[in-house]
Amino acid sequence: MGFRLIHPDDFEWKTRAHEPEEPPRHVAELSEPAGFAHTHANVWRYEPGTGAKGRPHKHKVQEETFVVLAGTLSMYLDDPPQRQDVPTGGIVHVEPGTPLQAVNHGAEELLLYAYGTPPESERAEILDSAV
């Protein structure tokens, strides 16, 4: 038995690569501080503006669940990509092998909890951008 509590003030935010003309996105990696052994989780912040976006990708074995904590997530799913707008409180579950790309088209910051299982030993396959 046991538990771990991670307070938002304790998040260690890292800025991820982005195109020079795009707003940056930031990640707080939670798997290690939470002690996850069989899952993977992050909190993402996408700045508002001209479309901060994640990398388009797909996983071989990992399924991912996204919970929108603030803002509106524009998730491009499948091949060809179909845009799904997900409001605050909404959830998107993505099965392994499904192409996806997360984007913030809104004027507000997007805050997103991303959870995946099982954790993959190799990186996701990076695809061409949907936007």
Predicted regions and their residues:
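Short beta-strand His + acidic residue motifs that chelate non-heme Fe in jelly-roll/DSBH
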Residues: G54-R55, M75-Y76, Q84, V94, ...
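Tight coil/turn sites that cap or link beta-strands
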Residues: G49-G51, T88-G89, E95-G97
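A short, N-terminal "cap"/entry segment at the start of jelly-roll beta-barrel domains
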Residues: M1-H40, E47, R123-V131
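Double-stranded beta-helix
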Residues: F3, Q101-V131
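A short beta-loop-beta micro-motif enriched in histidine and acidic residues
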Residues: S31-H40, G51-T65, D79-P80
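Short, charged/polar surface micro-motifs in flexible loops or helix N-caps
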Residues: F36-A37, E47-A52, T72, P118-S121
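A short beta-strand-loop-beta hairpin characteristic of the jelly-roll/cupin
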Residues: K60-T88
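Conserved hydrophobic/aromatic positions in well-ordered beta-strands
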Residues: N42-W44, F66, Y113
